[in-house]
């Protein structure tokens, strides 16, 4: 899909300029300073009540980055500008968004690009591929990601894929995650959800080491056999220190995103993500 209007070209230039320093500055800061953010699905109930106030509250807690999820595509341009102001006012940044199917075709892609550029995000991540069946289906997903990556590259932007459980289970003798990794160029991000990897018994360290430089962001979601996802980040079974070491030495991580699937039933979403951030600080001390 051509993106050649003068306004979009100007945005593309600005987007490229904004995105380029991230990896460079991360390398200069050192591994321990990789910023920590929040996948805003973790506060979805609060977000639905008051978008701007919830984002501001997350910033005041001390999170450095946020990632918006699929409903953001319903925003108007004015809403995106208001969100950007809150991000700037609280010192938050947004490097990526989670997206469903409409963000990857036609006018949906165009709108996703424009909204992401407004809020400073440079990566349009595919949140899942629920319709993919069989290895041929997963190869089509890889082909789609490759095509989107080509369209986004001149704009200083990227795409990527976020794993769930299904991508680790073999289909016709192959794991869909391996098909996606092998079938896409190296600039397609392999956003790593740790909890779902652990749930199905896959090896997180082996996956990171097999894909050097492609794990640009990590969803820090914990899991344990006894509680499933009903456990705060840092209190489950994930070997976080080994994971941090691998993604910082090999994976190419540029930012972390805490994701907490439970919260409203555990005293509230905002107190829960504060607890997760406190646990993060202990792990990184």
Q: Positions of the model-derived regions?
A:
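Glycine-rich, proline-tolerant flexible connector loops at the mouths of alpha/beta enzymes
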Residues: 67-84
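Conserved residues at the C-terminal ends of beta-strands
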Residues: 41, 69, 100, 127, ...
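Active-site acidic/histidine proton-transfer and metal-coordination neighborhood
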Residues: 17-27, 65, 72, 90-96, ...
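Alpha-helix N-cap/loop-to-helix initiation residues
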Residues: 44-47, 76, 105, 134, ...
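Histidine-acidic metal/acid-base catalytic patches
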Residues: 2-6, 11-37, 43-59, 120, ...
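Histidine-centered catalytic micro-motifs
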Residues: 38, 159-165, 218-220
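Catalytic-core regions built around general acid/base machinery
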Residues: 79-89, 144-152, 243-246
């Amino acid at each position: 899909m051509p993106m050649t209007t003068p306004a979009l070209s100007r945005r593309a230039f600005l987007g490229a300029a904004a995105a380029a320093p991230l990896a460079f500055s991360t390398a200069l800061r050192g591994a321990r300073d990789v910023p920590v953010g929040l996948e805003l699905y973790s506060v979805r109930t609060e977000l639905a009540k008051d978008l701007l106030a919830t984002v501001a509250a997350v910033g005041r807690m001390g999170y450095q980055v946020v990632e918006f999820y699929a409903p953001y595509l319903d925003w108007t341009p004015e809403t995106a500008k208001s969100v950007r102001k809150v991000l700037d006012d609280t010192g938050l940044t947004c490097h990526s968004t989670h997206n469903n199917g409409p963000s990857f075709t036609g006018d949906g892609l165009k709108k996703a690009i424009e909204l992401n550029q407004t809020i400073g995000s440079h990566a349009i991540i595919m949140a899942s591929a629920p319709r993919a069946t069989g290895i041929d289906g997963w190869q089509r997903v890889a082909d789609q990601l490759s095509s989107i990556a080509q369209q986004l590259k001149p704009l200083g932007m990227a795409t990527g894929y976020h794993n769930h459980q299904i991508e680790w289970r073999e289909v016709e003798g192959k794991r869909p995650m391996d098909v996606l990794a092998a079938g896409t160029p190296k600039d397609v991000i392999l956003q790593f959800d740790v909890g779902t990897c652990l749930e199905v018994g896959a090896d997180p360290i082996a996956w990171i080491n097999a894909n050097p430089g492609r794990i640009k962001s990590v969803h820090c979601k914990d899991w344990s056999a006894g509680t499933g996802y009903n456990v705060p980040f840092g209190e489950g079974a994930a070997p976080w220190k080994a994971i941090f070491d691998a993604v910082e030495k090999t994976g190419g991580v540029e930012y972390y995103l805490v994701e907490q699937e439970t919260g409203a039933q555990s005293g509230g979403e905002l107190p829960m993500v504060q607890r997760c951030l406190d646990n993060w600080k202990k792990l990184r001390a």
